[in-house]
Amino acid sequence: MLVITRKKGESLLIGDDIEITVVKLDDGSVKLAIDAPKKLTILRKELYNEVQEENKKATNFNPSILKNIKSK
């Protein structure tokens, strides 16, 4: 893992087309601006983990429960 120190207004580059800039520093939090291609999905880690968990639940679906649904 690479650890980098940045001040407000400073940036770091990832590859040729991703730039992350420190916009604001508060007590215990940092606001970042991310300039990246629109095709790239950017998620907070906690949201990513939540999506992964929901995907796991969806794969555990039991189709036999559909037998109890009456059609109109």
UniProtKB/Swiss-Prot annotation:
Job description of the protein: A translational regulator that binds mRNA to regulate translation initiation and/or mRNA stability. Usually binds in the 5'-UTR at or near the Shine-Dalgarno sequence preventing ribosome-binding, thus repressing translation. Its main target seems to be the major flagellin gene, while its function is anatagonized by FliW.
InterPro entries xrefs: CsrA, CsrA_sf
Subcellular location: Cytoplasm
The species this protein was found in: Clostridium botulinum (strain Langeland / NCTC 10281 / Type F)
Keywords, ordered alphabetically: Bacterial flagellum biogenesis, Cytoplasm, Repressor, RNA-binding, Translation regulation
Oligomer and partners: Homodimer; the beta-strands of each monomer intercalate to form a hydrophobic core, while the alpha-helices form wings that extend away from the core.
Domain of life (superkingdom): Bacteria
Gene Ontology biological process terms, A to Z: bacterial-type flagellum organization; mRNA catabolic process; negative regulation of translational initiation; regulation of bacterial-type flagellum assembly; regulation of carbohydrate metabolic process
Family statement drawn from the similarity comment of this UniProt entry: Belongs to the CsrA/RsmA family.
MF (Gene Ontology): mRNA 5'-UTR binding
Protein name: Translational regulator CsrA
Gene3D superfamilies per the UniProt record, alphabetical: Translational regulator CsrA (2.60.40.4380)
Taxonomic classification: Bacteria, Bacillati, Bacillota, Clostridia, Eubacteriales
GO cellular component: cytosol
